[in-house]
Amino acid sequence: MEKHDLLYEGKAKKIYRTDEEGLLWVEYKNSATAFNGEKKASIEGKARLNNEISSLIFSYLKEQGVDSHFVKRLSETEQLIHQVTIIPLEVVVRNVIAGSLAKRIGIEEGTPLEKPLVEFYYKDDDLGDPLVTEDHIAILQAATKEQVDILKVKAIEVNDALTTFFAGIGVKLVDFKLEFGVTADGAILLADEISPDTCRLWDAKTGERFDKDLFRRNLGNLQDGYEQILTRIEQKA
């Protein structure tokens, strides 16, 4: 397997073509961003941490019957994935009120939800990735009704699996963002990454933050928080 030309570069990853049809080479970056790219920094070791954590979580989800684009870990900062066409929606699952939801509805951060809340955000940097309803999604033609129904089911399946996974390492899964893609034959796969960049992760006993809020809100050292998550996962394995 060889890495060929750069296909796409985003805020946190570079994606390259390979010499095998349908497979892409992902290289994680040390960059950290928040507030739609308004806050930026380069953090040594972040690429390794996100790649290692995401690789381990995707492998766990596969064991739980959740299909994703992840094929295998290639190095500390690289992984191999199936090529998919990304559905332009971020699917956010919330178990505890935090972040923008707390501001939007005026309920104190940290309040548990009686059942998981699934939200959709339209992936458009110029618009600031706005919260959208299913009717908005239809108007935007971002996904079909059938696809939206599938995304909701898959999001709850992932939430059930990850809630158990993180509880096993003493971490509360507050909320998280998922992305999905469509394969050439029409299958919908979990895509992007699952890491402290995309999840709010609090220590189950102390409430200590181990996620990107450390950077976003200047709450502490991001590298230390992510390292704590990786260490706990590796100790459990």
From Swiss-Prot:
Q: Where are the transmembrane segments?
A: none
Q: Which UniProt keywords apply?
A: ATP-binding, Ligase, Nucleotide-binding, Purine biosynthesis
Q: Source organism's superkingdom?
A: Bacteria
What GO biological process term is on the record, naming one? 'de novo' IMP biosynthetic process
| Database matches in InterPro entries | SAICAR_synt/ADE2_N, SAICAR_synt_PurC, SAICAR_synth, SAICAR_synthetase, SAICAR_synthetase_CS
**Enzyme Commission designation:** 6.3.2.6
Catalytic activity from the UniProt record = 5-amino-1-(5-phospho-D-ribosyl)imidazole-4-carboxylate + L-aspartate + ATP = (2S)-2-[5-amino-1-(5-phospho-beta-D-ribosyl)imidazole-4-carboxamido]succinate + ADP + phosphate + 2 H(+)
The pathway this protein participates in, as annotated, is: Purine metabolism; IMP biosynthesis via de novo pathway; 5-amino-1-(5-phospho-D-ribosyl)imidazole-4-carboxamide from 5-amino-1-(5-phospho-D-ribosyl)imidazole-4-carboxylate: step 1/2
Q: Please name the top-level EC class of this enzyme.
A: ligase
A single MF term (Gene Ontology): phosphoribosylaminoimidazolesuccinocarboxamide synthase activity
Family, similarity comment: Belongs to the SAICAR synthetase family.
What this protein is called in its record is Phosphoribosylaminoimidazole-succinocarboxamide synthase
Q: Which organism is it from?
A: Halalkalibacterium halodurans (strain ATCC BAA-125 / DSM 18197 / FERM 7344 / JCM 9153 / C-125)
The major lineage groups are: Bacteria, Bacillati, Bacillota, Bacilli, Bacillales
